[in-house]
Swiss-Prot record:
Transmembrane intervals: 78-98, 114-134, 147-167, 170-190, 196-216, 223-243, 267-287, 298-317, 324-346, 349-369
Swiss-Prot/TrEMBL catalytic activity: 3'-phosphoadenylyl sulfate(in) + adenosine 3',5'-bisphosphate(out) = 3'-phosphoadenylyl sulfate(out) + adenosine 3',5'-bisphosphate(in)
Official protein name in the record: Adenosine 3'-phospho 5'-phosphosulfate transporter 2
Family, per entry: Belongs to the nucleotide-sugar transporter family. SLC35B subfamily.
Length: 401
């Protein structure tokens, strides 16, 4: 009996070891399958549910870029670029017109921060509505990162809106056109990027054009104030940092545009509300806007709506093509805004605006050229000299004959 019992025990141990080895091999094959699957263009993120929930894997394409419910990932890169550029130009040209129209209301120039508060409130509502239309509603970017982005967004838009109380609108826009300069500095210090001679030349041209435009504005514009220059310069610095931070966060965490807009602007709304409450600037602004609801809140709604649509396309540009390309596109849009500003709103004009603006445009061209050197071949100085010498020789030969 003892021998029989020992034989049964040995047999049971062997069966258990065999089952254990089989289960380990199955687990190894699962791990191998997961690794192979992760190497493809799609990935599986498995969320461990609570006891009352059932587990379901969420499958999402890494390259999906959705703007206002439209999936841009279905198009090629060139089509994506033209769609984003068209969206930026259409919505932001209307946005710029409405912004100048609001500040043309008598007595509104001191309400720049309150306009930013209303704008952030509308952006938060629009972002929440758009997020409900997306299947994946999880927040991917950490809260601390959003607090930093919200602070920079408040600085960018709040200081920019407030500067209009001290500056001519084209001057404010020409400052924004030179955002490439702080963006390049931000790219160097935040992402460790390197820029070539063409990019540096573009920054120099923009700087000289900006100085020339500001000097012209100081002699012709009746409401020129150095306070506005300081405010818009600080707004540019914040804007330069935010583009690089947004690009890094969205690519690292694969976040959607609607998520970025919702959390950054809702947190920014709290920042501005606390600031206006502490400085006693909320009451007078509310009283003034209550007397002119259509020309303030009505314009602000349309202003915020077009701005929200525009920022969605800008974020798509940042996510697909990077911060520098997005800045180049928005800079071209701002140049068009300056032209429309002189057409629709009466203001002093001097040809120094034209020459300084052309210098800024030259900087934009150099920036675009630096990104497409392999496609755009400009003749070198040596080639130009050779061509001129050959032309002279041919003319001399013709005269001799």
């Amino acid at each position: 009996m003892d021998l029989t019992q020992q034989a049964k025990d040995i047999q049971n141990i062997t069966v258990q070891e065999t089952n254990k080895n089989n289960s380990e091999s199955i687990e190894c094959s699962k791990i191998t399958m997961d690794l192979k699957f992760n190497n493809s263009r799609k990935y599986i993120s498995i969320t461990v549910p609570s006891k009352t929930q059932t587990m379901s894997p969420h499958i999402k394409s890494v390259d999906d870029v959705v703007v206002l419910g439209m999936n841009l990932s279905k198009f090629n890169k060139l089509t994506q670029f033209f769609i984003c550029v068209a969206g930026v130009f259409v919505f932001y040209l209307i946005y710029g017109y409405l912004q100048e129209l609001i500040f043309s209301v008598e007595g509104f120039k001191s309400c720049g921060w309150y306009l930013t508060l209303v704008q952030f409130a509308f952006y938060s509502i629009f972002g929440l509505i758009e997020l409900q239309l997306i299947q994946d509603k999880r927040r991917r970017i950490p809260g601390k990162t959003y607090m930093i982005i919200a602070f920079l967004t408040v600085g960018t838009m709040g200081l920019s809106n407030t500067s209009l109380g001290y500056l001519n609108y084209p001057t404010q826009v020409i400052f924004k056109c030179c955002k490439l300069i702080p963006v390049m500095l931000g790219g160097v210090f935040i992402q460790g990027k390197r820029y070539n001679v063409a990019d540096v030349s573009a920054a120099i041209c923009m700087s000289l054009g900006l100085i020339w435009f500001t000097l012209a504005d100081s002699t012709t514009a009746p409401n020129f104030n150095l306070t506005g220059v300081v405010l818009i310069s600080l707004a540019l610095c914040a804007d330069a940092v935010i583009g690089n931070v947004q690009e890094k966060a969205m690519k690292l965490h694969n976040a959607s545009n609607s998520e970025m807009v919702l959390y950054s602007y809702s947190i920014g709304f709290v920042y501005i509300l606390l600031g206006l409450t502490c400085t006693s600037g909320l009451g007078p602004a509310v009283t003034f806007c209550a007397k002119n609801p259509v020309r303030t809140y009505g314009y602000a709604f349309l202003f915020s709506l077009t701005g929200y649509f525009g920022i969605s396309f800008v974020l798509a540009l940042i996510k697909i093509f990077g911060a520098l390309i997005a800045v180049t596109v928005t800079t071209g849009r701002k140049a068009m805004t300056i032209v429309l500003s002189f057409i629709f709103f009466a203001k002093p004009f001097t040809f120094q605006y034209v020459w300084s603006g052309l210098l800024v445009v030259l900087g934009i061209f150099l920036n675009v050229y630096s990104k497409n050197m392999d496609k755009i071949r400009l003749p070198s100085l040596y080639d130009l000299i050779n061509k001129s010498v050959e032309a002279r020789k041919s003319r001399t030969l013709a005269q001799t004959v």
